[in-house]
């Protein structure tokens, strides 16, 4: 057991589905065969979630990762906050829960940087609550990058059938062409290639490149970004151990990608990658941040206030995220 990686699982929003899906996931005994799970959150909130799910699990507060027992049936939790669930408005973001969410994340990141845990799996957070607590970062990824001093990082969405990475992430569609640059493309491919080799065990990664424009621009008739930016940037990798294929029109690319033709697809913008990904991996998709000095995976969904407190939230993405964190940690040994 001691040879298995310790995965710090942040609870996410105390009034979202995070606590419930963690309980459901840790009911699966197989999780303890691949890692040592450590919940970083709030003891009372987790006990409330257990009373709803009735999984039969007990929760044991631990003072540190070294103090945890990692025994199936007795979930170890680092109680970073001490909230009173009865005083929290259900399904409602507030500054108190926002502050707690940030503390869960920063605690986990700091333990991972010190190698006291080997990976972090994050539960869903509510950005309005985080902003109400006085923080201005856009989301998990930006906070993780700031906390670890990382300037070059890539968002990957990963599942058994498809992996996608994004050259641009959260911005208006009208702004995308100006941000699809040679420098950003090369950075995205380099970070992704390194992660595929080191964390996914793929020594010579093959990646498809999605075109920005319909029909890959059709010789400039529908845009020139392929001709002027993407294809010249792809030339940078000729002769390297990263093989690039494309740029392919996005309307046909994903049919072949989900059949395993490539190890990842480089997408130019958010919805180009996430729409096909979620069509395939809606219940078991994983968000993992590449380029950080720590391993971070996350569920591929939000706080789901409409399901919070019902016990009906699907835990497939949380289980998949923990499994992927354990895989990456094992490959890095």
UniProtKB/Swiss-Prot annotation:
It is an enzyme of class 1 (oxidoreductase). The keyword Magnesium applies. Catalyzes the NAD(P)-dependent oxidation of 4-(phosphooxy)-L-threonine (HTP) into 2-amino-3-oxo-4-(phosphooxy)butyric acid which spontaneously decarboxylates to form 3-amino-2-oxopropyl phosphate (AHAP). SUPFAM superfamilies: Isocitrate/Isopropylmalate dehydrogenase-like. Pfam families: PdxA. Keywords: Cobalt, Cytoplasm, Magnesium, Metal-binding, NAD, NADP, Oxidoreductase, Pyridoxine biosynthesis, Zinc. One of its GO terms (biological process) is pyridoxine biosynthetic process. It catalyses: 4-(phosphooxy)-L-threonine + NAD(+) = 3-amino-2-oxopropyl phosphate + CO2 + NADH. The active site is located at the dimer interface. One of its GO terms (molecular function) is metal ion binding. GO terms for cellular component: cytoplasm. Binds 1 divalent metal cation per subunit. Can use ions such as Zn(2+), Mg(2+) or Co(2+). InterPro entries: PdxA, PdxA_fam. Substrate binds at residues 140-141, 278, 287, 296. Homodimer. Its EC number is 1.1.1.262. A divalent metal cation binds at residues 170, 215, 270. Pathway: Cofactor biosynthesis; pyridoxine 5'-phosphate biosynthesis; pyridoxine 5'-phosphate from D-erythrose 4-phosphate: step 4/5. Its cofactor is Zn(2+); Mg(2+); Co(2+). Belongs to the PdxA family. This is 4-hydroxythreonine-4-phosphate dehydrogenase.
